[in-house]
Each structure stands twice: as structure tokens, then as C-alpha cells.
From Swiss-Prot:
GO terms for molecular function: cytoskeletal regulatory protein binding; small GTPase binding. Residues 31-45 form the CRIB domain. Residues 171-193 have a biased composition (Low complexity). Coiled coil: none annotated. It comes from the Eukaryota. This is Cdc42 effector protein 3. Highly expressed in the heart and weakly in the brain. The gene is CDC42EP3. The modification Phosphotyrosine is found at Y63. It comes from Homo sapiens.
Length: 254
């Protein structure tokens, strides 16, 4: 044997003229099984094109050697030499995981369908509208006329308690029918007009009371007005300017 032969391949009793075969020296016990988690990145199954993933550049373009492709060997159906691909991306193919009879702890990489891998979740326009509304200008709080209406209702109730009560009061208060409510309104208006002749003779229930809204200045408006006033009244003294010195020199020369 040559000197470059590894030590574990050198036979102890080496006789001249006799050649040893590797299968006589090596034994299956010398090959250790994979330790821990084992993942294979290249796989060629029985289905051929529909059961292949990983880098199959070692085929060197001989894709007809794949099982199931001996009859139909077309280079256009296969990718280039140095491309990584997973052929199980078609929706028609069904991937069936079969455990390896030799390697018990071999785990295949998960299959990702092409329709699932290329489809992205659609972004609804509602999300964009909500974002635009959030970044929009702040809206001023709305002024409601509910307190004014409550005060008017309390005044009317106090006046009705002090005044004379007619038969139409109960019907108007319970809101029974349209005719009874109209009679109650007439009785209320007549009783109030008798007690308070200075009031205008109009039906108070038909005309809604106007909302007395007084819009006061908010804190932001007051701070803004103070800021603008301070900026307008700001006076900066930068000292004597160069133009003044030039004019003074010109006056002296004259």
C-alpha cells in the first residue's frame, strides 16, 4: 500500500502480492449513526418531479434519471443546475411523509405549498382609513344644549305644579294618544297664560327652545394668543450695525 493510505486502512499482516479489499477491512460497526436531530436538505422521492426538493445540481442536467421521468424528459420542465427548489409546491401533488427505514430519527423539512407561500394577506382599506383619521387634525369638542333644555324643563315643571291642573295633564304626561296630548297642551297653555299675562300667547310646546351656547376660549387658544402676542412684542437689540458705521465715516469725510 502507498504511504498516503490512512492508518486505519492498513492491514496488520500485509503480504506482498496480495491485495486487500476495502469491504474486508471496513465493517458496518465503524460507521456511526447520526447523533441528535438529523435533517436532510436534499430529497428525491419515488414520484420524481413531484417529490424532490433541495439542490440537485449533482445530476448535471440529467433530469431524466429521476424516477418517473424516463418517458418524459424535457429540460424545460426542470429548473437550472444551481437552483434550490421544492417541487411539492403544486396544488395537485399530495405529500405523504414516510419514515426512513434506515434512519429512525430523520426529519424532513416541512412542505410549503406554492399557493400558500405566494399568497399574502390582503390589507383592507379600513386599516388605512383608521390610520389617516388618527393622524388627522384634532376635532374640537361639540357643545350640546342638553343642560339648557334640562333647565327649561325644570322651570316648566315647577310652574305646572304651582298652577291649576286640568284633565288633559295626565293624558299629556303619559303620552297616550295624539288627541289627548293636544288637549293637554291647550289646557297647559291656557292656565299659564292666565297666571302670566306678560308672556306671549304662543304654543310653547310647538316651538323648540333655542340652545343658548356660549363658546368660550379653550386653553390651547389662550396659549396660542399669548405666544403670538409675545412674538409681536419681541424686540432684539443686536448692537450697532455695519451700515451705521459706514454712514458715520461718510459724514466725517464730508
Amino acid at each position: 500500500m502507498p504511504a498516503k493510505t490512512p492508518i486505519y486502512l492498513k492491514a496488520a499482516n500485509n503480504k506482498k502480492g496480495k491485495k486487500f479489499k476495502l469491504r474486508d477491512i471496513l465493517s458496518p460497526d465503524m460507521i456511526s449513526p447520526p447523533l441528535g436531530d438529523f435533517r436532510h436538505t436534499i430529497h428525491i422521492g419515488k414520484e420524481g418531479q413531484h417529490d424532490v426538493f433541495g439542490d440537485i445540481s449533482f445530476l448535471q442536467g440529467n433530469y431524466e434519471l429521476l424516477p418517473g421521468n424516463q418517458e418524459k424528459a424535457h429540460l424545460g420542465q426542470f429548473p437550472g443546475h444551481n437552483e434550490f427548489f421544492r417541487a411539492n409546491s403544486t396544488s395537485d401533488s399530495v405529500f405523504t411523509e414516510t419514515p426512513s427505514p434506515v434512519l429512525k430519527n430523520a426529519i424532513s423539512l416541512p412542505t410549503i405549498g406554492g399557493s400558500q407561500a405566494l399568497m399574502l394577506p390582503l390589507l383592507s382599506p379600513v386599516t388605512f382609513n383608521s390610520k389617516q383619521e388618527s393622524f388627522g387634525p384634532a376635532k374640537l369638542p361639540r357643545l350640546s344644549c342638553e343642560p339648557v333644555m334640562e333647565e327649561k324643563a325644570q322651570e316648566k315643571s315647577s310652574l305646572l305644579e304651582n298652577g291649576t291642573v286640568h284633565q288633559g295633564d295626565t293624558s299629556w304626561g303619559s303620552s297616550g294618544s295624539a288627541s289627548q296630548s293636544s288637549q293637554g297642551r291647550d289646557s297647559h297653555s291656557s292656565s299659564l297664560s292666565e297666571q302670566y299675562p306678560d308672556w306671549p300667547a304662543e304654543d310653547m310646546f310647538d316651538h323648540p327652545t333655542p340652545c343658548e351656547l356660549i363658546k368660550g376660549k379653550t386653553k390651547s387658544e389662550e396659549s396660542l394668543s399669548d405666544l403670538t402676542g409675545s412674538l409681536l412684542s419681541l424686540q432684539l437689540d443686536l448692537g450697532p450695525s455695519l451700515l451705521d458705521e459706514v454712514l458715520n465715516v461718510m459724514d466725517k469725510n464730508k
